[in-house]
Amino acid sequence: MKIILTGATGALGSHIMFDILEQFITNNIDGKLFLISRNKGKTSAKDRINSILSSDYTPKVLLDFGLEKLTGFLEIIDTDLANINDSFSDKIKDAYFIHAAGLVNLSTDEDQKNKIFKENAEITKAVFKTFSPFIKKFIYISTAFSSGIRKGLIANDFHNLDFELAHRNAYENAKFHSESFVIEQCKILNLPYQILRPSVIGGKMLGLENRYFISKYMVFYLMAKFFHFTAQRKNEQENVRFSINSESGLNIIPVDYVAKIIVNTFERDDIKQLNIVHNQSFNLVEGLQIIMKEVGYANFSIIQKTFDFSYSNTIEKLYYESIGKHLEPYLTAPANEYDTTLLNSILEIPKLDAESFTNMIRYARINNFKDINV
C-alpha cells in the first residue's frame, strides 16, 4: 500500500501519520508513506518529521518500534506544496493521496482573503493537477463548516443543497471552493475521491496516553488563551460583554478520533462525503462559563449586541479587535446538529461533557497554551 500525506507536521496531519504507521506495524502491512513536507529555516523536512516521531507525545507503539525502523516506512519529499512537481511519478503510482495540509484561519479581515484562498484553494488545485494522473484516490480534508451558516440537522452531502450558501469567512469559502473543484475534476477524470470534514478540533480523548494533548491551540483555545494571560496581567478585571446565541453550540471533536476516522475510512468507496463531528454540540454559554472559570477571568456578561455597540473598556476592545471579531460569527450562529449515524458506525464518538471540556482547557492552561512548532 502506498499513501501520500500532506500536512504531516500539523496538529491533525501528525496524528494521521501516527495512525497510518501504527496500522502498518500492527497489521503487518508492506506499506510506504510519502510525506510532502518542507524545511523550516535550517531544519530539514526529515529532521522535522523525525522530531515528531521521537517526541514526548509520540504514541508508545511507535516509540517502542523505534525511529530507525519507522523511517523504513517513510519517504520524505522535501518541497513546498506551491512548488511541487511530478518528477517522482513512478514511485507514487496508484497511491492514495490524503491532502491534510491547509491554513486554518477564521479571519474576517479583507486583507487576509487572498492569503487564505491561496493556502487552501489554489494550492489544493495545484497539488491535484500534479498528482491526479498517477494516484488511485484523492482524499481531501475539509471542514464541517464549509457550507457556511446552517440550522437544523446537517447531512453529509454539502453539494446537493437547495439553498444559497452564506459563508462566515474566507476560510469556509476557500474550503468549499476546493471541495467543489475536487468533486468536479474527479468526476471528469473518473478518479475516486473522498471529502472528509472535521469540525473544531480539540485535544485527544481516545485512551489515556497523552490525554487532551494537541500540538496547536486554535478556535476556542484562543479565547481561553486570551483571557488566561489577561487575568494574569491585570489586577482589576474589566467587564467583557459577549453576544451569544444561548440555544447554539460549538461542535468539538478530539484530534485523535478525527485521525482514526480518516485512516479507517479513506479506502471505502461507498463514502464520498463524511462530516467528522460530534453528535452533540457543546452549548456556547456553558462552554464560555467553563473557559472563564478555568482561566480565572470572572468579570463577563452575555448580552444582545446592538448596532450601536461600542467598547466599554480596554480589555473588551482588545478582545474584539484581535480574536473576538473572528469568533463572533460562530457564537451568534443558529443552533444546528449533524447527522452522525454513519460516522458513529465506523467508530463510536467519545463523550464530550463538562468534565472533559474542562480538562481540555485545563491541559492547555497547564501547558501555558504553548504550541509545539517543529
Question: What are the language-model segments listed below?
Answer:
Residues 3-26:
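N-terminal Rossmann NAD(P)H-binding glycine-rich loop of SDR-like oxidoreductase domains
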Residues 28-31, 37, 337-374:
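Amphipathic terminal alpha-helices
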Residues 32-71:
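Glycine-rich phosphate-binding loop and adjoining beta1-alpha1-beta2 segment
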Residues 62-94:
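Conserved Rossmann-fold cofactor-binding substructure of NAD(P)-dependent oxidoreductases
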Residues 96-99, 108-113, 118, 122-173, ...:
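Conserved Rossmann-fold NAD(P)-dependent oxidoreductase catalytic core, especially the SDR/UDP-sugar
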Residues 185-249, 255-257:
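NAD(P)-dependent short-chain dehydrogenase/reductase
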Residues 229-242, 307-349:
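A hydrophobic C-terminal alpha-helical subdomain
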Residues 261-326, 368, 372-373:
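Mid/C-terminal beta-alpha module of Rossmann-like enzyme folds, strongest
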